[in-house]
Amino acid sequence: VFHLVLADGSVEDVPMGVFEVSEANRLAKCLELKAYDFMLRFDRSFNGFETVGTAYDFIALCCKRCKVEFANKRAEIDAMPNGGVTLSVYTENDIETCRDVLFYVAQVLGGFFIINREGKLELRKYGKDPVMKVEQRHRFSSSFSDFITRYTAVSSTNKQTQIAEYYALDPDNGLTMNLGVNPLLQFGLKETREMLCRNILAELSVIRYVPFDSDTIGNPALD
């Protein structure tokens, strides 16, 4: 826990997370520890290739196998775009671990997974609303790009035909997110795959930011 002193003098207790020690080295004056969060637990082999279910079913299977609690509720995942669609793993795939499965499930849901401060697996979405303003006096250096990053198309490769299926907004004048060969996006009619990909695109299209590098005063309350 980090005890953060706020501007009004009050103290905010900021949990820094849950970690597992993987290596300990005793030095002359201290004990050096190397630790990782619970995401490392998902580097276990996945053998549920016969699984058929919704995104939540795949997540729950991985969490149970790797002994990590899932922070999101089933109703929350089912309500997301593509959350209620029945998925299955295409036979020819490059899935080796549960972490690979989570990567592809996150793609389908248009989000990403993290291990939160309570040590639970959590699905998050890309936001569009500012959460904090960092004043110039709090920045030691800054370097801003001269373009805006935004996505107006997605590309998903059909494993059977080896053809990249392209879906775009109108106008299509932004970046394209390449989904590669996602084993969960292979089955069903072309119309079904298009629906899944367009739902992913709808989630990605909210992303709009200017890439930058900056050295600032650290704030452990920010994720």
Regions found by a protein language model. Give the residues of each.
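An acidic/polar, Gly/Ser/Thr-rich interaction patch typically located in mid-to-C-terminal regions
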Residues: 1, 100, 107-112, 141-223
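Short, acidic/charged, Gly/Pro-enriched secondary-structure junctions
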Residues: 1-25, 53-65, 217-223
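Residue-level recognition of well-ordered beta-strand positions that form the cores
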Residues: 3, 34-36, 215
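Short, surface-exposed beta-strand/loop "edge" segments at domain boundaries and coil↔beta transitions
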Residues: 7-10, 42-44, 123, 129-133, ...
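Intrinsic-disorder/low-complexity loop/linker signature
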Residues: 8-9, 82-83, 119, 162, ...
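Short amphipathic beta-strand/extended segments with alternating polar/hydrophobic composition
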Residues: 14-20, 132-139, 164-165, 180
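Charged- and aromatic-enriched interaction segments used to assemble
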Residues: 27-145
